[in-house]
From Swiss-Prot:
It is found in: Nucleus; Chromosome. This is Histone H2B type 1-K. Monoubiquitination at Lys-35 (H2BK34Ub) by the MSL1/MSL2 dimer is required for histone H3 'Lys-4' (H3K4me) and 'Lys-79' (H3K79me) methylation and transcription activation at specific gene loci, such as HOXA9 and MEIS1 loci. Similarly, monoubiquitination at Lys-121 (H2BK120Ub) by the RNF20/40 complex gives a specific tag for epigenetic transcriptional activation and is also prerequisite for histone H3 'Lys-4' and 'Lys-79' methylation. It also functions cooperatively with the FACT dimer to stimulate elongation by RNA polymerase II. The modification Phosphothreonine is found at T116. It comes from the Eukaryota. The modification PolyADP-ribosyl glutamic acid is found at E36.
Length: 126
């Protein structure tokens, strides 16, 4: 069975630059698509909690998947709550209720207090 022809090596995952240019065969440069992630924010929180600790790219990938998963769960639950109450807008109240439903005990309490603090900070900055 003949082996398929190998193309150029795949670009390295998780590179530092958001937009780089890949070389095409005919000499024209093409912009690589942006990969959105929470890595910058995960890193900032890590440095607040443990300033002398680093994180591997594999661990960062896991954290990114975790944040995406939790975001989707909360958004889905908040959407359901808005639908049940015949509302077309997801407010902080739906998010708060979704967090209370999804997260266990003490974790939910901490998440709600941090969320309330963030909303207060945002509204006071306006």
């Amino acid at each position: 069975m003949p082996e398929p022809a190998k193309s150029a090596p795949a670009p390295k995952k998780g590179s530092k630059k958001a937009v780089t240019k890949a070389q095409k065969k005919d000499g024209k440069k093409r912009k690589r698509s942006r990969k959105e992630s929470y890595s910058v924010y995960v890193y900032k929180v890590l440095k607040q909690v443990h300033p002398d600790t680093g994180i591997s790219s594999k661990a960062m990938g896991i954290m990114n998947s975790f944040v995406n998963d939790i975001f989707e769960r909360i958004a889905g639950e908040a959407s359901r709550l808005a639908h049940y109450n015949k509302r077309s807008t997801i407010t902080s109240r739906e998010i708060q209720t979704a967090v209370r439903l999804l997260l266990p005990g003490e974790l939910a309490k901490h998440a709600v207090s941090e969320g309330t603090k963030a909303v207060t900070k945002y509204t006071s900055a306006k």
